[in-house]
Design a protein with these regions (language model features):
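Hydrophobic ligand-binding cavity/cleft-lining segments
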Residues: 1-42, 147, 154-157
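Beta-strand/loop substructures that line and gate deep hydrophobic ligand-binding cavities in soluble
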Residues: 77-129, 134-136, 145-147
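Short beta-strand segments that buttress and anchor functional surface loops
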Residues: 49-56, 74-80
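Short, surface-exposed coil-to-beta transition loops
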Residues: 3-5, 59-63, 83-88
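A short, structured loop/turn motif at beta-sheet edges
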Residues: 14-15, 42, 66-71, 90-100
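Generic structural detector for well-ordered beta-strands
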Residues: 7-11, 38, 52-54, 64, ...
Length: 157
């Protein structure tokens, strides 16, 4: 399957956006692309952390964090027979006092071409839903409690 990527600018602090992204069990509260996310370990999200993700129209999948740079990015990977899925979540400074969030997903393996035929539209739709839901969630909270400093809105350089 060809990689799919989307990005969105969010008018909220980096801390707010990162907090929403790293709290994976709460994703179903702000994106309809997730039915449930269950952490399979305790503690802060870190390399090696695992979560069982249930999404509409898809079987449950266990994702493992393979890379994490706090307040900047995390990548997680799901390995199943014939297919490996990799999803990236990256934060960077956006225009004005916004945070740019880039979400991407790619699949490799013997079954990737078949999955592309069957589910590429669904994958794109879910990634877009995640981006839009994250924006709504973070900006609604930002309006309720604006940051005290415009610098707080910026992703680290």
């Amino acid at each position: 399957m060809a990689p799919y990527e989307t990005s969105i600018n969010i008018a909220a602090t980096t801390d707010k956006v990162w907090s929403a992204i790293e709290d994976v069990e709460r994703w179903p509260r702000w994106t309809a692309s997730m039915t449930s996310v269950e952490r399979l370990d305790r503690g802060p999200l870190a390399r090696g952390s695992r979560a069982r993700v249930k999404q509409p129209k898809l079987p449950p999948v266990v994702w493992t964090v393979t890379d994490l740079e706090p307040r900047r990015s995390f990548t997680w990977t799901a390995r199943n027979p014939g297919i490996t899925s990799v999803a990236d979540h990256q934060l960077s400074p956006g225009p004005g006092n916004t945070v740019n969030v880039r979400l991407s997903v790619r699949q490799t393996g013997l079954l990737a071409p078949l999955l592309s035929l069957l589910a590429s539209g669904l994958t794109r739709r879910y990634v877009n839903m995640e981006a839009e839901g994250l924006k709504r969630y973070c900006e609604a909270d930002a309006v309720a409690s604006p940051a005290s400093s415009s610098e707080a809105h910026r992703a680290p350089a």
